[in-house]
């Protein structure tokens, strides 16, 4: 377990740009593959940990039945793999962390949307842009 944690931290440290400005990702497919092997156990465990947390956000029942539980877990895992690919773009990392650390207050939300809906809209926006960035920079090149 410690070995996986060290490799994951090394992967994250090399993936993050040194400057605060966002820049194009210059990592090779080979380095991404080795980084993914190191990060996969971390992302998988985080996926299970976030599963219950996001149940409240998405208003899902805590008692999952077989298929729905696995679908939800692996869907979250897929989204976090997209985030792992996007981690070398500091803008997305900054926005992602800021959104997850926001205290949800009624004064911060638009008047016609509840806070939970607004929170989901922001996260969906980030995931969509991460996916577009992934396709543009990795799948089409």
Curated annotation (Swiss-Prot):
This is Uncharacterized protein YEL045C. The keyword Transmembrane helix applies. Required for optimal growth under alkaline conditions. It is a multi-pass membrane protein. GO terms for cellular component: membrane. The lineage of its organism: Eukaryota, Fungi, Dikarya, Ascomycota, Saccharomycotina. It comes from Saccharomyces cerevisiae (strain ATCC 204508 / S288c). The chain crosses the membrane at residues 38-58, 67-87. Induction: Repressed after alkaline pH stress. It is found in: Membrane. Disruption phenotype: Growth defect under alkaline conditions and citric acid stress. It comes from the Eukaryota. Its main location: membrane. GO terms for molecular function: ATP binding.
